A protein has these predicted regions:
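Acidic/glycine-enriched edge-of-secondary-structure segments
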Residues: 2-6, 62-80, 98, 203-212, ...
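Peripheral docking tails and interdomain loops at the edges
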Residues: 6, 342-385
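A charged, amphipathic alpha-helical module
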Residues: 1-33, 143, 147, 151-278, ...
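A short, acidic, amphipathic alpha-helical segment used as a generic capping/interface helix at domain edges
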Residues: 88, 305-322, 339-340
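An N-terminal, globular interaction/scaffold subdomain
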Residues: 38-89, 97, 112
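Acidic/His-rich segments in extracytoplasmic proteins that coordinate ligands and/or metal ions
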Residues: 83-155
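Redox- and metal-dependent alpha/beta enzyme cores, enriched for Fe-S-associated oxidoreductases
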Residues: 29, 40-41, 46-58, 243-306, ...
Length: 385
């Protein structure tokens, strides 16, 4: 298949909310477990080390109607929480044995409790990330949290998780993150060779496959990207900010790119490249994961920082990406993204950097208004910056 044909095929997989890859894996490994991982970041290495399949659960992307979830969760929260719960209530996640949620926002916190109530047969973990990164006890605190997860996975699987298992999983995911970062390097240096629409499909596919299979796929497809014969265009280099949890419709990314933008950086699917450097493979593996979360994590609105403010990290991203403008693209009702917007847009105004903002939701189907806004934004950057 050509690169374009592969992208079309992979899109059919990520659009299928029945999780066909999970069902196939479960049929082939009936005695093994599947763990659902809610965004933004969860330690995929732990269930992998237990011989389980960690799978990203990122909502339904507008592919299903919300018929049951609104009786159990507020209707005025983000789409991803409601549609994820709907996936569970309609038994589309029946082959999942556990779910991981994290302390990223009030909605995610509440969703973990709602999940425990409605799915008592599943192991439900609520992960507490450290909040004060300057505290010397932070690595110890988070390592204890990881140890608790390991102990519960051992009970679920009936398998002892050794340090060797953990180190091998860290090594495996280090390689996958390296390949995902390579996609982003291509997207930034030569955006005409790889659109964000295409890169997103390749990364999203990885949330539905065993990590080894995804890494092999990327190793085969990256050379194809370099060989594409595509002419650079006079597009504006933009960065998307605010889409770190609920996933924007793929059509929205197409509209932005068709309007004259190269999306050279974004915060989509951050877990695929969460660490700026490989997690160390020497010493205690749980300490390495904990220490890496504190010292090697990528900038995100859902993570607290120690020595650098969010404004500093944000401006560093703009500078390194040679960005002409920023698109604040946030889900409706997403408090972390919308609260950060106020602070970050003030900083952009001080730095005289162009920006625009709009909101989206999973079931969004009309994009003409956003297309016109982005086209106007592109013209203002090209002719008046």
């Amino acid at each position: 298949m050509t690169f374009e044909e592969k992208i079309e095929y992979y899109r059919t997989i990520i659009d299928d909310v029945s999780y066909p890859t999970v069902n196939k894996w479960k049929a082939e490994h009936p005695n093994k477990k599947v763990v659902g991982m809610f965004p933004v970041y969860t330690p995929y290495e732990l269930p992998h080390a237990a011989g389980m399949l960690p799978i990203g659960v990122l909502g339904a992307g507008g592919k299903i109607e919300i018929d049951h979830a609104d009786s159990r969760i507020q209707s005025f929260v983000c789409s991803i929480a409601r549609s994820t719960l709907e996936l569970g209530l309609t038994e589309r996640l029946k082959n999942f044995d556990a779910m991981y949620f994290t302390s990223i926002c009030d909605v995610a916190r509440n969703l973990s409790g709602i999940w425990q109530t409605n799915f008592p047969q599943q192991l439900v973990e609520y992960i507490h990330f450290p909040q004060n990164m300057n505290n010397t006890s932070a690595p110890k605190h988070y390592r204890a949290e990881l140890q608790k997860l390991v102990s519960n996975l051992e009970q679920l699987s009936g398998k002892k998780i050794t340090n060797e298992d953990l180190l091998q999983s860290i090594k495996t995911f280090n390689r996958n993150r390296e390949l995902c970062l390579e996609l982003y390097q291509i997207k930034s240096a030569t955006p005409h060779l790889l659109s964000t629409f295409e890169a997103y499909i390749l990364l999203r596919l990885g949330t539905l496959l065993p990590v080894e299979e995804h890494s092999k796929l990327l190793e085969e497809i990256i050379p194809q990207i370099h060989q594409r014969n595509r002419t650079p265009r006079d597009f504006v280099r933009v960065m998307i900010e605010g889409s770190f949890c609920e996933q924007p419709p793929l059509e929205l990314m197409q509209v932005i790119e068709d309007a004259g933008c190269y999306i050279v950086d974004d915060d989509l699917l951050l877990h695929t490249r969460w660490f700026n450097e490989p997690v160390p493979l020497n010493g205690d593996p749980l300490h390495s994961l904990a220490e890496s979360y504190i010292n090697r994590s990528r900038y995100s609105s859902v993570r607290h920082y120690g020595n650098k403010s969010r404004k500093e990290q944000f401006l560093e991203k703009i500078k390194s990406g040679k960005v002409d403008g920023v698109l604040f693209c946030a889900p409706k009702f997403c408090e972390p993204a919308l609260l950060d917007y106020v602070v970050l847009k003030d900083e952009l105004e001080k730095q005289n950097i162009a920006y625009m903002t709009f909101e989206y939701e999973e079931k969004m189907g009309v994009f003409e208004s956003i297309r016109m806004q982005v086209e106007t934004f592109v013209e203002s950057v090209l002719f008046f910056s």
